[in-house]
């Protein structure tokens, strides 16, 4: 190895995320001065099988949410293990950290410590190789810009309103380029604002930049979005498709084994009834994707959903798979879902994230690279989406710099790729 790509210094610090909570940022410097920096996101609705985000628990600092322990793990333990190692060997770097941690869920050093370092090492190695990150990770075949899943209305755990589902998204599949898709999304977002104003509804934005108006039902959320699409001069179905993130674990009553929909007068649904509820929505509206339609432990319900809708629409497992290879392979062998949400901090290292994406592709599952509700200005996920030709990205609405930063980076990448850039639009859903 050229010793120039040896890791010389690793420095972590506590910074702020988009919700005013502390998070971990890591700098990595190689022997030749190559530099990489990464900041770690965090989620609001967290799956019970996710890698552990280490928080200090000291109530006198940041309400217990400080990350000084994780920072210290990077500066001492991780630095000690990685100093002098070759930054180009990502798999080895990640494995050394996993071995030093020694737990299944990264609970000892913290997934936030490990991930921050993992991504910063990759960025330093890319700088050393004089390549943009997407090219360094993905090689010469990395050229597909993702279809954005833009979360423009929030409900559920992300909002204080009478809407059960956590996210209502638009997917500009009729665009010819990412640049055009972004413009369509922005125009629809502004149209939606005026539709909501016209109905005297709140237009303040939530954690991910979407609106959280006090709508009366799930269907009303869909209807106002369709109005906004048309008002912006686009055609639902032809130009723009819809997506839902039900995040149904949040309205699942474990003791009753029922799904309780507040927007339907607190009616209780069995798994089969909820599947029928979705099927009815899909037959009425141009919905192409539903995420976390059933609780993460309701495998029978998931099987039913997959049998009923799996050939028609994309069924994304988020809490179901938590970007975890073991959970995903169980899903694949049981014929559950047909798509996986990829959140780097759910698994906690770059190489494991890439393995999950690879496994999903081999099984003809689509990949959706995703942000978290607590974000920073870090744009690594834009590069991961292009590097892996994932085809889809979920990184919020059309406001708030923590979201827009990702879109802006994709604009730059598309420009840099020039004529070789691909935007597949509707064909992204190749497995339907």
Swiss-Prot record:
Q: What does the record say about how the cofactor binds?
A: Binds a second Mg(2+) ion via substrate during catalysis.
Give the reactions, separated by semicolons, that this protein catalyses. Answer: (2R)-2-phosphoglycerate = phosphoenolpyruvate + H2O
Give GO terms: molecular function aspect only: magnesium ion binding; phosphopyruvate hydratase activity
Q: Where does (2R)-2-phosphoglycerate bind?
A: 166, 343, 372-373, 394
Q: What is its EC number?
A: 4.2.1.11
User: Which cellular components does GO assign to this protein?
Assistant: cell surface; extracellular region; phosphopyruvate hydratase complex
Residues annotated as catalytic: 208 (proton donor), 343 (proton acceptor)
A Pfam family annotated for this UniProt entry: Enolase_N
The pathway noted for it is: Carbohydrate degradation; glycolysis; pyruvate from D-glyceraldehyde 3-phosphate: step 4/5
Q: Name one GO biological process term.
A: glycolytic process
The residues that the entry says bind Mg(2+) are: 245, 291, 318
Annotated InterPro entries: Enolase (IPR000941), Enolase-like_C_sf (IPR036849), Enolase-like_N (IPR029017), Enolase_C (IPR020810), Enolase_CS (IPR020809), Enolase_N (IPR020811)
Q: Where does this chain mainly localize?
A: cytoplasm
Cofactor(s) needed, names only, are:
Mg(2+)
Job of this protein:
Catalyzes the reversible conversion of 2-phosphoglycerate (2-PG) into phosphoenolpyruvate (PEP). It is essential for the degradation of carbohydrates via glycolysis.
Q: Which family does it belong to?
A: Belongs to the enolase family.
Q: Mind telling me what this protein is named?
A: Enolase
What organism is this sequence from?
Answer: Leptospira interrogans serogroup Icterohaemorrhagiae serovar Lai (strain 56601)
Protein's gene: eno
């Amino acid at each position: 190895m050229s010793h120039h790509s040896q890791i010389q210094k690793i420095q972590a610090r506590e910074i702020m995320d988009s919700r005013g909570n502390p998070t971990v940022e890591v700098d990595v410097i190689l022997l030749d001065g190559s530099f990489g920096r990464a900041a770690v996101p965090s989620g609001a609705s967290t799956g019970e099988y996710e890698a552990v985000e280490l928080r200090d628990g000291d109530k006198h600092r940041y309400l217990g949410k400080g990350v000084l322990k994780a920072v210290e793990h990077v500066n001492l333990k991780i630095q000690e293990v990685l100093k002098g190692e070759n930054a180009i060997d990502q798999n080895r770097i990640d494995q050394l950290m996993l071995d030093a941690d020694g737990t299944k869920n990264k609970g000892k050093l913290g997934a936030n410590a490990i991930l921050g370092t993992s991504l910063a090492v990759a960025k330093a190695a890319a700088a050393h190789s004089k390549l943009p990150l997407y090219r360094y990770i993905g090689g010469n075949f990395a050229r597909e810009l993702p279809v954005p899943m833009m979360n423009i209305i929030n409900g559920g755990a992300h909002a204080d309103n009478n809407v059960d589902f956590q996210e209502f998204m638009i997917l500009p599949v009729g665009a010819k380029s990412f640049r055009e898709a972004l413009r369509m999304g922005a125009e629809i977002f502004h149209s939606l604002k005026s539709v909501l104003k016209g109905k005297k509804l709140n237009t303040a934005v939530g954690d991910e930049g979407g609106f959280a108006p006090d709508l009366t039902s799930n269907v009303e959320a869909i209807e106002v979005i369709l109005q906004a699409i048309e008002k912006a001069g686009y055609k639902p179905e032809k130009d723009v498709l819809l997506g839902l993130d039900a995040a149904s674990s949040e309205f699942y009553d474990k003791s009753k084994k029922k799904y309780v929909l507040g927007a339907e007068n607190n009616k209780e649904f069995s798994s089969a009834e909820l599947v029928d509820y979705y099927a009815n929505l899909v037959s009425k509206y141009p919905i192409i994707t539903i995420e976390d339609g059933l609780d993460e432990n309701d495998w029978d319900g998931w099987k039913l959903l997959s049998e009923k809708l799996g050939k028609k629409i994309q069924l994304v497992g988020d809490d179901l798979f938590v970007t975890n290879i073991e959970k995903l392979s169980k899903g694949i062998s049981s014929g559950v879902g047909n798509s996986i949400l990829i959140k780097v901090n759910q698994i906690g290292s770059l190489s494991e994230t890439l393995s999950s994406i690879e496994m999903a592709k081999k099984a003809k599952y689509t990949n959706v690279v995703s942000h978290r509700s607590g974000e920073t200005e870090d744009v690594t996920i834009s590069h991961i989406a292009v590097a892996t030709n994932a085809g889809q990205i979920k990184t919020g609405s059309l406001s708030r710099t923590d979201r827009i930063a990702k879109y802006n980076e994709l604009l730059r990448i598309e420009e840099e790729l020039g004529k070789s850039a691909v935007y597949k639009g509707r064909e992204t859903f190749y497995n339907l």
